[in-house]
Amino acid sequence: MNVNEAIAYIHSVFWKGSIPGLSRTQELLAKMGNPEKKLKFVHIAGTNGKGSTAAMTASILQQAGYTVGLYTSPYIYRFHERMQVNGVQISDEELVEVTEFVKPFADSMTESPTEFELVCGIAFEYFLRKNCDIVVLEVGMGGAFDATNVIECPEVAVITNIGLDHTDFLGNTLEEIAATKAGIFKEGGNAVVYRGTAGVEQVFETVCAEKHICLRKADFDGLRLISHGLEGQVFDCGARKQLQLPLLGVHQLKNAAVVLGIMDTLIEKGWNITEEHIREGLRLTSWPGRFDIVGRDPLFIIDGGHNPQCIEALVANIQDYLTGRKVIALTGVLADKDYGDMYKPVMPLVQEFVCITPPNPRKLEAAELAAHLTAVGAKATACQSIEEGVRTAISLAGNDGVVLCFGSLYTIGSIKEALDEQ
């Protein structure tokens, strides 16, 4: 098996889609010898901000001298991003080796695992082989019935910002979604949560009381933005002053406040993390695809925003960082997203939309998106390919303008590839 064959095998169960439930993952891991039981975790659920929160957490723990696994999804540019140890992605050789180990166990199951469940098995085995001291584990979707929730009580269970997404699986209200995500809270454990609505916080408080969990809410009241620009931002959070963060946007400060809560909890549990580790870890955090500057001439920004809360953050970033600039949106979206509402807040800030078709079975055709945007009063054009979209957007932006890509995580890798080939 070579790396392409390994990835093809992993993707071969893609047709199963998402099937909530833990039984398949538990069966697979039991056959493998339960690697997850020999690892420690920071387990992170939430609608938005999971990846950024995970990246900051892993960066700080790495600065503290620990061997840190990081498991995230989906990937932006290449599959290997989903499994990293101390910032280094799994190698081709390691991916082949671990996939070959897991394959016979998966193949022997009566009900084969989904792709996500298979990748979880591969990741747990990989992190064990790399002797990780701790793994920062991002939930795929939801919480209670997500494949990652097979783990025993983590060092900290974390819930980031909650919004209405995947309502067909998770619930129709914020409170229902919060309850599903709180399924990662284990009896007698520790939890850190993003401050939400009164109803959402009540859900967390109730679950934590029932399960004797020590609950910590992120300190948003202590947040103060000192300065910000396209290179990053400087902020205070409570007693911690002049912290530097390269991730852009006020919403990232709230994610950082969650991370500081995680660190305070880990310190209380005996992990050796100093204030300098925290400061350096935040300063060195890297997380691609989130208001991410990937080109300078013209300014070319990629953002994975694809639901109303992400778009709210994107609008704030355009207003904070791009005021007075000509903004050309390069965008594609999945057909099952509420794209009507998604584009509405961005329209007044964008001079023209260049529409592309995402490379995904759930895609909305570029022509259909352009027709919708034109019908609601925007200037929009459809392109036949992502390459044509990149060329068109750059041409429209000119030297002084900005190309802003958003709408779907699934377009980012192809856009970056096309940009690199310009």
Region roles according to the model:
Residues 197-216, 231, 299-300, 308, ...:
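C-terminal helical cap/extension that packs against the catalytic core
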Residues 119-169, 201-242:
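Extended acidic/charged loop-beta regions that coordinate divalent cations
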Residues 44, 52-69:
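A conserved segment at the C-terminal end of the G1
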Residues 194-195, 207-229, 246-250, 278-284, ...:
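Beta-strand->loop->alpha-helix junctions that form or flank phosphate-binding loops
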Residues 22, 26-30, 34-37, 63-152, ...:
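ATP-dependent carboxylate-amine ligase catalytic core
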Residues 37-38, 134-137, 145-158, 162-166, ...:
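Nucleotide phosphate-binding/pyrophosphate-handling subdomain across enzymes
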Residues 1-40, 168:
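Positively charged, low-complexity intrinsically disordered leader regions
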